[in-house]
């Protein structure tokens, strides 16, 4: 399935801009700096990568550029797979070209405030269509819902697609669970 096991420290790449456009020279510098710094994998177009502010063409350009500059040196995670509509998200995943990526990162539905059962069902639908392993991104400050440790454990037991968790709840007790 994926060429690499994701281990260690991953960096969510910023997407630099100049005069309202993606600054690809600066993005290359960011990628090279991270690789030289010894990180173990890169995340392109996560929350930090401004995916929500880019149009689909710009997103694809950033992803393709990141693949090109990385040149297979590190595992790559594509990080802009969150949506408050599960059907729309799974449709996006089903038609997305994941060539060059080793995993995808997906946040729970935003705004809707689903129950833990709703979050579980959402992620199971994502797992059904994803050709890649999934990093669960728990970021309640952006989604208005917290993915509990119990739900994460339930997902991990339900499907081998769930590879890791990016825990951004800001709760050390939860992170330790």
Spans of features found by a protein language model:
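Active-site beta->alpha loop and helix N-cap motifs at the rims of alpha/beta catalytic domains
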Residues: 2-146
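Catalytic alpha/beta core domains of metabolic enzymes, predominantly
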Residues: 128-129, 140-177
């Amino acid at each position: 399935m994926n060429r690499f096991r994701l281990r260690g420290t991953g960096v969510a790449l910023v997407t630099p801009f100049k005069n309202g456009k993606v600054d690809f020279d600066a993005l290359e510098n960011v990628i090279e700096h991270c690789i030289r710094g010894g990180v173990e994998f890169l995340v392109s177009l996560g929350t930090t990568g401004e995916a929500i502010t880019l149009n689909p063409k710009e997103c694809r350009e950033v992803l393709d550029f990141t693949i090109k500059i990385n040149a297979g040196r590190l595992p790559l995670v594509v990080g802009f797979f969150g949506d408050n509509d599960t059907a729309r998200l799974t449709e996006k995943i089903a038609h997305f070209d994941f060539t060059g990526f080793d995993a995808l990162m997906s946040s729970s539905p935003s705004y809707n405030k689903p129950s833990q059962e709703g979050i579980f069902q959402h992620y199971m639908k994502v797992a059904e269509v994803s050709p890649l392993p999934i990093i669960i991104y728990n970021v309640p400050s952006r989604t208005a819902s917290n993915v509990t440790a119990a739900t994460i454990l339930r997902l991990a037991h339900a499907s081998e697609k769930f590879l890791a968790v990016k825990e951004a709840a800001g709760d050390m007790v939860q992170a330790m669970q």
